[in-house]
């Protein structure tokens, strides 16, 4: 009796804290390592792109870059990817895309950025044109600072291409629905631990007492930061390619790990590009997925835009901005790991809807609190006169940081793993090209729609700032979050029909 009870306890303990069987480690470990490396690079690039663009230009320019540069680039990528998937294996696509992105990042770090005065319009001429045409000043700034804009755009595309699309497409092909319920939360747990490592690493590299000084003299700290960070990104990208090669040759060919190993991975003829998108357009399921992903991008970008403008006021240089950003990334990693464990148990004990709706609810509540602080800052400070021991600016940055940590923590743990389960029961066409369209385009549509709202306001009112337009952004933010919750509810009903 005791033995049976003991085995039952061990079984329940294993199911809760380590549901991966020993014979599955040959599949689980390399996939977790691949996710770790992709997210490692993603977060270094996230720190660099914001630190460079916002410190070198302004926070307002980010919205224009997302609308007029990032979104067109994302749309172009989806078209190219749909062509590539008909001609190349996943392995080759991963190599080609890695080579393209890393080549530009290296070119920027070692050629363009150190000689930015050669490649960009002279600041005095740019300022003169912007003053002469105030309604078009941000568009002039986009063109005049093209190097920063291209770097920002490619760094923005990295997470949607390499993590959301390529990694999860790889994982969805390799993993069954039953395995996904056990694996995906732990992929997220191990993969997102990279944020903590990146946080500590980039805090050191961007600080005045950086370890780099022990190995080389530093003439310009911001250029050294970008060059050292880019070198690390390039090395980790090579490791990613090695892992993809290993998984393709050793996991996909093993019947123990992959059910289709004996017959080979699907080689059935794919639809043409036009026919493929017509097929996707008819899917209500994918349209709901698109709304959910776009809503996150839209909502979080509204909050982040205001928050990042406040960060620049407090930390005006590239290195100080990067150091603060690194601290934020570190705590985001901690939040993701904690919420991943919570999400795993929520998903096991409740239905998919309960787990999936956590993200939009938390983002809406914390986002509204942040906007209330920005809009009614003087009233709040006078109400708590003497009780708040920091400046209004420092308080806004701190509260915004907490909001973003909680929002990203729930999104990258609970929501991402919940969303990926929605693709598993789909057919191959929707699982590949449909996923590409939803994952790459939707997030950028969300962010660019948010950026479009901001860009229209800044174009019509050149003197506007993020602080002055915060009341408008708060109303839009609330509406978008409610639409996201509604879409999650609707897609849950669709998922139940096919799962």
From Swiss-Prot:
PANTHER family found in the cross-reference section: ADP,ATP CARRIER PROTEIN 1 (PTHR31187:SF1), PTHR31187
Organism: Rickettsia felis (strain ATCC VR-1525 / URRWXCal2)
Membrane topology, as annotated: Multi-pass membrane protein
Spans traversing the lipid bilayer: 25-45, 61-81, 93-113, 148-168, 183-203, 223-243, 286-306, 327-347, 356-376, 380-400, 468-488
Family: Belongs to the ADP/ATP translocase tlc family.
Function: Provides the rickettsial cell with host ATP in exchange for rickettsial ADP. This is an obligate exchange system. This energy acquiring activity is an important component of rickettsial parasitism.
Domain of life: Bacteria
A single MF term (Gene Ontology): ATP:ADP antiporter activity
Coiled coil ranges: none
Keyword terms of this UniProt record: ATP-binding, Cell membrane, Membrane, Nucleotide-binding, Transmembrane, Transmembrane helix, Transport
Subcellular location: Cell membrane
GO cellular component, one term: plasma membrane
The name this protein goes by in its record: ADP,ATP carrier protein 5
């Amino acid at each position: 009796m005791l033995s049976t009870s003991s085995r039952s306890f061990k079984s329940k303990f294993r199911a809760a804290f380590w549901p991966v069987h020993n014979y599955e480690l040959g599949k689980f470990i390399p996939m977790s390592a691949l996710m770790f490396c992709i997210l490692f690079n993603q977060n270094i690039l996230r720190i660099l792109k914001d630190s460079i663009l916002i410190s070198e230009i302004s926070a307002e320019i980010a919205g224009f870059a997302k609308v007029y540069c990032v979104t067109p680039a994302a749309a172009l990528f989806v078209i190219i990817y749909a062509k590539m998937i008909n001609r190349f294996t996943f392995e080759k696509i991963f190599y080609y895309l890695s080579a393209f992105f890393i080549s530009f990042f290296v070119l920027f770090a070692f050629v363009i950025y150190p000689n930015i005065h050669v490649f960009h319009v002279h600041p005095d001429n740019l300022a003169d044109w912007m003053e002469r045409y105030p309604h078009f000043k941000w568009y002039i700034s986009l063109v005049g600072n093209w190097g920063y804009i291209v770097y920002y755009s490619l760094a923005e595309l990295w997470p949607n291409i390499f993590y959301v699309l390529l990694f999860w497409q790889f994982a969805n092909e390799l993993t069954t629905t039953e395995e996904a319920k056990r694996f995906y939360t732990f992929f997220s747990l191990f993969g997102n631990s990279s944020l903590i490592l990146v946080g500590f690493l980039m805090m050191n590299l961007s600080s005045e007492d950086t370890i780099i000084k022990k190995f080389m003299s530093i003439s310009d700290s911001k250029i050294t930061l970008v060059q050292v960070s880019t070198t690390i990104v390039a090395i980790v990208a090579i490791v990613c390619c090695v892992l993809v090669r290993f998984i393709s040759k050793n996991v996909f060919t093993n019947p123990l790990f992959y059910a289709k190993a004996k017959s080979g991975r699907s080689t059935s003829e794919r639809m043409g590009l036009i026919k493929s998108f017509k097929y996707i357009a008819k899917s209500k399921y994918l349209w709901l997925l698109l709304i959910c992903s776009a809503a996150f991008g839209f909502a979080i970008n509204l909050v982040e835009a205001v928050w990042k403008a406040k960060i620049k006021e407090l930390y005006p240089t590239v290195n100080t901005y990067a150091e603060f950003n690194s601290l934020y990334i570190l705590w985001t990693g901690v939040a993701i790991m904690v919420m991943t464990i919570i999400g795993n148990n929520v998903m096991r004990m409740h239905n998919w809807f309960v787990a999936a709706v956590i993200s939009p609810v938390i983002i809406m509540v914390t986002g509204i609190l942040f906007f209330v602080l920005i809009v009614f800052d003087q009233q709040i400070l006078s109400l708590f006169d003497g009780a708040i021991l920091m400046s209004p600016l420092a308080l806004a940055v701190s509260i915004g940081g907490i909001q973003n940590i909680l929002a990203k923590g729930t999104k990258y743990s609970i929501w991402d793993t919940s969303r990926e389960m929605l693709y598993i029961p789909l057919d191959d066409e929707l699982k590949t090209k449909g996923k590409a369209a939803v994952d790459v385009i939707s997030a950028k549509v969300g962010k660019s729609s948010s950026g479009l709202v901001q860009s229209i306001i800044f174009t019509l009112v050149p003197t506007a700032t993020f602080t002055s337009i915060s009341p408008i952004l708060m109303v839009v933010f609330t509406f978008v979050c409610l639409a996201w919750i509604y879409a999650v509810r609707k897609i849950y009903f669709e998922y139940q029909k096919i799962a």
